A protein has these predicted regions:
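A structural signal for short, well-ordered beta-strand segments and their strand-loop junctions
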Residues: 69, 94, 124-127, 161-164, ...
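Active-site-proximal loop/turn and secondary-structure-junction residues that shape catalytic pockets
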Residues: 43, 74-76, 99, 129, ...
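Accessory C-terminal segments flanking Radical SAM cores
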Residues: 140-241
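Basic phosphate/pyrophosphate-binding loop/patch that engages nucleotide-derived ligands
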Residues: 105-125
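Loop/helix-junction capping segments adjacent to catalytic residues or to phosphate/diphosphate-binding pockets
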Residues: 47-48, 102-106
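Canonical Radical SAM [4Fe-4S] cluster-binding loop centered on the CxxxCxxC motif
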Residues: 1-19, 215
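Conserved SAM/AdoMet-binding glycine-rich loop
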Residues: 6-7, 20-95
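Conserved strand-turn element in the central/C-terminal portion of the radical SAM core barrel
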Residues: 95-102, 121-152, 157-159
Length: 241
């Protein structure tokens, strides 16, 4: 990422291009249609092969995607090739707005939006008055019985899935935080898309997406405020240095 924000993990490594392609192919081999498919980071515009990824997804799977989007903090101007393929495959740029905390970003937003408009690329700049919520991952370690874990999971039911290779994760935050903070929890909390070979796989996918599993919760739930995280607002994009 181009920022060094407090309360944000910073130890994630880029996926290599082959792994990105595998993730995309595996995901869409099982999906008929998805409302929104998002490329996220860190900062996706720092990924050197971003234009190749957009072309790969656009060529093979754009018809299966409602909204094809990229989430960016607005600090990086995409190169011309990335802008061209973004226009071709109707990519929406979702621009997080941290200008209240980092006023210099207002000029960055102006420059970015100007380039997006030049190439007729859709974008959405969010309001400055946003805030982040503290999930508690870096300090919570609740001793919860199975019933409490299931209650926490059922109240949350995050809508944000993540695909990595053949693995579909129910909660992108649980997977990424466990890896970034080296908790090594929830190693088996995923659906193996490669194993969905029988005629009943769509039912299995639907059940997974609705939150049904043998355990009924994720291992990382005991480290998370879950739905109550909304009661723990924190300053947006507060910098470490």
């Amino acid at each position: 990422c181009a920022h060094a924000c407090y309360n944000v993990g910073n130890q994630t490594e880029d996926l290599d291009l082959a792994e990105v392609y595998k993730s995309v192919d595996m995901f869409f081999s099982k999906m008929d249609y998805i409302n929104e498919f998002v490329l996220i980071g860190g900062e996706p515009l720092l990924y050197k092969d971003l234009s190749k990824v957009i072309v790969y997804i656009g060529n093979k799977y754009r018809r299966k995607i409602g909204i094809f989007s990229i989430t960016t903090n607005g600090t990086i101007i995409p190169n011309e090739e990335t802008l061209k393929v973004s226009q071709k495959y109707q990519v929406l740029y979702r621009i997080s707005n941290y200008a209240k905390e980092l006023p210099r970003l207002r000029q960055s937003h102006i420059k970015l939006i100007k380039r997006l408009q030049e190439f007729e690329v859709d974008y959405k700049l969010y309001d400055e008055d946003g805030y982040w919520i503290d999930y508690g991952f870096d300090y919570l370690n609740n001793d919860m019985d199975e019933e409490k874990l299931i209650q926490t999971f059922d109240r949350c039911l995050t809508p944000c899935r993540e695909v990595r290779g053949n693995k579909l994760y129910f909660c992108v935050m649980a997977r990424s935080v466990s890896d970034n903070l080296h908790f090594n929890e929830g190693q088996d909390d995923y659906l193996d898309l490669e194993q969905l070979n029988d005629d009943n796989y769509k039912k299995i996918l639907l059940e997974f997406n609705l939150g049904y599993s043998e355990k009924g919760y994720l291992d990382m739930c005991h480290r998370c405020h879950g739905m109550d995280a909304a009661n723990y607002p924190i300053p947006i994009a507060e910098q470490l240095v």
